[in-house]
Amino acid sequence: MSLHVKGPVCQTCGDIGFEEALVFCDSCMFESIHRYCLGITPIPFTEYITWICEDCDNSESDSDCNEVDQTVKKKKKSRNQPLVVLAEDNVLQEPLEGSKREESSCSRKPHELTCLDGNGESVLEAADSSSVPDHSSCTSKRKEVDQTANLGHILERSEKKKKKKKKKKSINHSPPVLAVEDHELQGTTNVVEPVEVSSSSPTKETMESKRQESSDSRKPHELTCLVGDSETANSSSVPEHNSCAVKKRKLSSGNKQIQLADGSSSCRVAESNMPLTLTSRNYRAQPIKIPIWRGLMSVKGGNSCTMDGIVAHVSSLACPKVHETASSLKGRLSAEILPRLEVWPKTFLKNGGPKDESVALFFFPSSESNDEKVFDSLVDKMKKNDSAMRCVLNDAELLLFTSYMLPKDSWTFNSKYYLWGVFKPRQTSRY
């Protein structure tokens, strides 16, 4: 008998065909198929094609199913294993962990509960129904634990809100002002105890709404909080001083009422950090502690001199426009001495002279300055000659006067006379 060895045959067409086009199974390496019988786009014979026959494909799928069944059985066995619980005498520290323990204890079977007593020996709990807690009692315990967890979260949120409110209050506090060495200014009397005004009081809300209305009514090209005289009041770029007339407001806190002045020429609206410690008669502007300008001042005129180490402090009643203009001052100011009446704003004449709230900047010699005596002598000469100084800036003029021009109780600060200034818009040529 002669044995005929069959060659590879394509599973699709059943013929040998082109043996070069046969592709063998990657799993059994026995079954084959033609490249052109796969039903895919033509591929060169040199490229490798991955193909698995039907028999190998079915066997692999069956093995995968068996593996999945084995993993499922292993998971079920691990769930059915007895759980070990440690006895705890202390109260639950974290409500979330307590809720998890309650759930796990409720899901256990009676014969699977194993505990440790105080001596560390394992004790098997009785399988009686009396020793096993009911599911209803477990659910009630779980609800109690969840309620304690919610209460803990609510308390944490309330504490965070309180901390945020404290931070906001500390930010809204008034800026520090220069401390008075003698603890009193000349001529101060009848100091009233400070009255606290809560942030939620209606009076504060009305004050803030009035500030916003007044600030919105300003034109963008106006230099607000700057002193203007009658000559420049006709131009649209200069606000009238009459619009800064003093208005009284009543602040109620409990059964106490205090009347305060809004401020006249220096600022249209007082800052929200206005201290409420003095009545309207004795309430005065104070220089803010941190100077906004520090530099050299050269004086030209009858008393020519140069003073170094001069500092300027913004008034506590000054508006944001004063801060903006003062912060743009150069390190060297050139001042010209002129007769006071020549540069005296007409608004001061109409309102009976300047008040402490008319001050925009306070000028003092710094503690490091060596020209303190020169500064004091300049103030004395300006008082005797009834003089003033003018510094020409880009968009405004800085007018400087002696403290003698203010009310008597504002003449000195730390027993020293000083200079104070206001900003005045520059006149633009009409032609």
From Swiss-Prot:
The residues listed in the UniProt record as binding Zn(2+) 1, with positions renumbered to this chain, are C10, C13, H34, C37
UniProt entry tagged with the keyword Ribonucleoprotein:
no
Keyword Ribosomal protein attached: no
Q: Which residues bind Zn(2+) 2?
A: C25, C28, C53, C56
Q: Which Pfam families does the record match to this protein?
A: SPOC_AIPP2
Where is composition skewed (Basic and acidic residues) in this entry? 205-221
InterPro entries per UniProt: AIPP2-like_SPOC, PHD1-3/5-6, Znf_FYVE_PHD, Znf_PHD, Znf_PHD-finger, Znf_RING/FYVE/PHD
Q: Where is this region: Disordered?
A: 125-221
GO MF annotation terms: histone reader activity; zinc ion binding
Provide the GO biological process annotations: negative regulation of transcription elongation by RNA polymerase II
Locations of Polar residues compositional bias?
128-139
Residue ranges annotated as compositionally biased, kind Basic residues, are 160-171
Q: Where are the zinc fingers (PHD-type)?
A: 7-59
Keyword annotations for this protein, in alphabetical order, are: Metal-binding, Transcription, Transcription regulation, Zinc, Zinc-finger
Show the SUPFAM superfamilies listed in the entry. Answer: FYVE/PHD zinc finger
Q: Which domain of life is it from?
A: Eukaryota
Subunit structure, as described in the record: Interacts directly with AIPP3/BDT1.
Function recorded in the entry: Together with AIPP3/BDT1, cooperates to form a BAH-PHD bivalent histone reader complex able to read histone H3 lysine 27 trimethylation (H3K27me3) histone marks in order to regulate transcription, especially to prevent early flowering; promotes AIPP3/BDT1 binding to H3K27me3.
- Name the UniProt record assigns to this protein: PHD finger-containing protein 1
Whose protein is this, by species? Arabidopsis thaliana (Mouse-ear cress)
